[in-house]
Regions:
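C-terminal catalytic lobe of FAD-dependent flavoproteins
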Residues: 293-295, 299-369
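Dinucleotide-binding Rossmann-like beta1-alpha1 core, especially the glycine-rich loop
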Residues: 51-135, 288-290
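Helix-loop-beta segment of a Rossmann-like dinucleotide-binding subdomain
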Residues: 88-101, 113, 120, 124-171, ...
């Protein structure tokens, strides 16, 4: 997959899950694609993610909810497709997610959310405390109840990224393990002509900026990009013996089972590009996880890590064409929803590049909004 390329039709900047999805989708539509990724940053968002597909769980406006549900549902077909073409299992698990209320106010809020989601045609249930205890033994004994979204779930983010990159390579994507210093334009920034690397320029008709929290640092962009890093700390511990696998969520955190581990998260910290772990952050995570699954109190974390999410001021990703520079596209700013929206973002960018339009209304996510 790694090649010395001097020109192509599309250059994707960033090899995390969003960039990998965009590169694969463009190649799938017959375009000649190169993906620039100098190497994984220890604080990158994709490998740090737990991989929840929580389209119906986290607070969202109508535009984000619709995008999330659509993105989640794509994994139903993407997972077997990637398994067939690459032999890689992305760990798609449609287990359902329970969002648990620990007080009456939270319970009332979640009951309202169940009613609203049902009215919108989504599958969503309210579990009384006794129903929750029966469905999720050992979970949240002090709960007042839970919203249960049976079609939500999870994927393994690392496996997903590897599979997207592998399938991209099968489709002809060239991997350039180099850092993009700046985009190159002509006609007073009216048109993209490629990207500048440390030792050369690679020509292209289209450049897709998909470098997550590092996107604003790419030189030559026509205007400041409103994306900032937000640190999310994570921890893992052994999944309690005898406890059925589950994905549990509340206002204080979440816990999900993957293999023999309990993945616990996560903080939301404005710490710049500081990807360090803190005692306070891990304590916060463990406290939230043990509220959801008290058996975790006896098993201290076996590993900890952090990632830097790319977050925008309005919480929506930036997806689509630059309003002024022809051939410049953005797929960044996904915040906590990068894994959830990766496949859909790839399809949107692929359709825009190949056909000039997408069947998805991306006006709420446009760079010019």
């Amino acid at each position: 997959m790694s090649h010395k390329v001097s020109s192509c039709e599309v250059i994707v900047v960033g090899g995390g899950v969003i960039g990998a999805a965009c590169a694969r989708a463009a190649a799938l539509r017959g375009l000649q694609v190169a993906l620039c990724e100098p190497g994984p940053d220890r604080a990158a968002a994709s490998p740090a993610s737990a991989g929840m597909l929580a389209a119906q769980i986290e607070p969202a406006d109508d535009a984000m909810r619709g995008l999330g549900v659509r993105g989640r549902d794509l994994y139903e077909t993407l997972a077997p497709a990637l398994l067939e073409t690459t032999g890689l299992d992305i760990g798609f698990w449609r287990a359902g997610i329970a969002s648990i209320a620990f007080d009456d106010g939270a319970a009332d809020h979640l009951r309202d959310a169940v009613a609203q989601q049902r009215q919108a045609g989504l599958r969503c249930d309210w579990l009384e405390a006794e129903d929750l205890a029966e469905r999720f033994p050992g979970a949240a004994p002090n709960a007042r109840g839970a919203l249960f979204a049976p079609e939500d779930g999870a994927v393994d983010p690392a496996a997903l990224t590897r599979a997207l990159l592998a399938d991209g390579g099968r489709l002809g994507v060239s991997l350039l393990p180099e850092r993009v210093l700046r985009i190159v334009t002509a006609e007073k920034q009216a048109r993209v002509t490629g990207v500048a690397l440390a030792d050369r320029t690679v020509s292209a008709e289209h450049v897709v900026i998909a470098a997550g929290a590092w996107s604003p640092g790419i030189g030559g962009l026509p205007r400041p990009l409103p994306v900032e890093p937000v640190r999310g700390q994570m921890a893992a511990a052994p999944w309690p013996s005898g406890t059925p696998p589950a994905i549990l969520y509340c206002d204080h955190g979440y816990v999900l089972s993957r293999g023999s581990e309990a993945l616990m998260g996560s903080t939301m910290e404005h710490a710049g590009f500081d990807g360090r772990i803190t005692d306070a952050g891990i304590a916060q995570i463990v406290d939230g996880a043990t509220r959801l699954l008290p058996a975790l109190a006896t098993t201290p974390p076996t590993r900890t890590w952090a990632g830097l999410r790319p977050v925008t001021p309005d919480g929506r990703p930036i997806v689509g064409r630059d309003p002024e520079t022809q051939g410049l596209w953005f797929a960044t700013g996904h915040g906590r929803n990068g894994i959830l929206l990766a496949a859909l973002t790839g399809d949107i960018i692929g359709d825009l590049l190949a056909h000039g339009e997408s069947e998805v209304d991306i006006s709420p996510f446009a760079p010019a909004r």
